[in-house]
Amino acid sequence: MIYHSTRNEQLTASSTHAVLQGIAPDGGLYICDPAALHFDWRAALEKDTLSMAADILHALLPDFENMEQLVRDSYAGKFPTSDLTPLTPVADKYVLELYHGPTSAFKDVALSVLPRLIVAAAKAEGMKGDVVILTATSGDTGKAAMEGFHDVPGTRITVFYPYGGVSAVQQAQMATQEGNNVRVCAVRGNFDDAQTGVKNIFAACKDRDLHGAMLSSANSINIGRLAPQVVYYFRAYGDLVKAGRIRMGDVVDYTVPTGNFGDILAGYFAKEMGLPVGRLICASNANDVLTEFLTTGRYDKRRPFYKTTSPSMDILVSSNLERLLYLVSGDAGYVAQLMAQLNEQGWYQVSGDILARLQAVFGCGCCNDAGAAEVIGRLWREQKYLCDPHTAVAWSVAESHTRGEAPMVVLSTASPYKFPAAVLGALGEKTGSDEFAMMEQLHALTGTDIPANLRGLEGRPVRHRDVIDTGDMLNYVLSDVLK
C-alpha cells in the first residue's frame, strides 16, 4: 500500500517511511484508502485481541515484517488482561474502557506499539542515527509516549505541554518520568500553541542537517499512532457479538470524546475497512469547534479557548480532521486549500456536498463542565459506575444520539483517578488543592481501586522542570539534537 500526503498525492511513501517520518514534507498528513484494503473483518473477529490487532496493523502497515510478534512484544506485561480494552454494560449503553494500560489513559493502546514500529521502520529504511520524537500533549499523550519510548535504543523523545493546562496528576506523571532519552517541557500557551510549535519545528528542520538524526512524532498525526486505535472498535464489536447482544453484520454506534479527532477517525477507518459501524458521534466540551463544524461545515478556530475539567479535549485545531477531509473529498488540492486558509485566516467552510457526506456518518454534540459533573454524579448514584470527565462528556452527548435499533458504545478514555478533583466535586464532596490526597479520598468514598501507576506518584522525584515560550521551542529541540 502506498501512502501519500493529504495535500499532495504525488508525495508518496511506504508505510515504514510514513511511520518514521511522521508528517509529510509539505506539512500534510500521510493517508491511505482503508476502503481499498478488502479486509476480511469477519475472520479478524474470530481471533484473540492480539492476533486481531496484528491482522489490522498488517493491513494498514503492510511493509512491516513479523507484525504478530511485534504486537505481542509491545503489549507483554503492560495490560492486566490480554483483551486490553474491556467492554462494560452500563445502563442502556456499553462503556469501552481504554484506560487499563501503564499510564491509565487510552493513549497507552497505541503508544505501547508505536516505539517498536518506529524502531522497525528505522531498520527497514536503513537509518543509522537516532529517531527524535517530538510530541505536543494536552495531558495524556505525553506521559504515554515517554513511558513507551523511555530507554528505547536509537530514540530520543521531547514532550511539550501547555503550562498550567494539564491536571496536577498528569503533570506529575510527566515531571517524574525516568529514562535517559526523555525530556518534557512546559510551554507558555495552550495545547494549540504547543502543537503548532511542533509542526513549525518539523517545517524548520526539513532541510537542516541534524547530524544523522531524524524527527518523527508520537501524536496521532503519525499514522503509526492512529492505526492501533482502530483495533478497539473491532474488539468492542466482537465482544457484543460474543455476548449475544448483536448478530454478525448488525450495526453499532460509537460515541467518542475527542479534541484532535484521532480517536474518532480510527472508528471511521474501522468502518471503511468493513466493520458495521453505524453512526460515529463526536463529543466535545465547551471548546466546541468540532460540533460547529459537523453541524454547519464551517471550521473556525477564532473563538475563546476554555480550560475545562476535561483538559485532553481543550483543543481548537483538530489535526486529524485533515485526513477525514481527504477521505471524504478525494481531492488533495482541495484539502491543501482549506488548510492554507485555516493557517492564514483561521477558518474555512466546506461545500454542501462534503458536509452532507460527513453528516451521513458523523453526529455531534457538546457538554460543558456542569453537564459532565451531572453525568458523573448520576452514573455513580444510579449505576455505581465511576467515570472521568471526558467519558462523562461522551455519555452526555450519547444520550441524545442513542437509537433503539443499534447498541451505543461510549469510549472511556481515562481513569477517573487522573482527575480526582473534578470527580469528587461531581459527587458532592469538598475538594482541596492536593490532588493526590483527593485520590485517596475518592478511593475511600467509592471503594474503587487507584491504578497502581498513580499510587505514590507524589513521592517520586521531579526530574523535569523546564518552562519556555513557544518561540523558543525550536532552539530547545536543536540543543538536544545537535549536542
List each model region and its residues.
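PLP-dependent amino-acid enzyme catalytic core
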Residues: 1-483
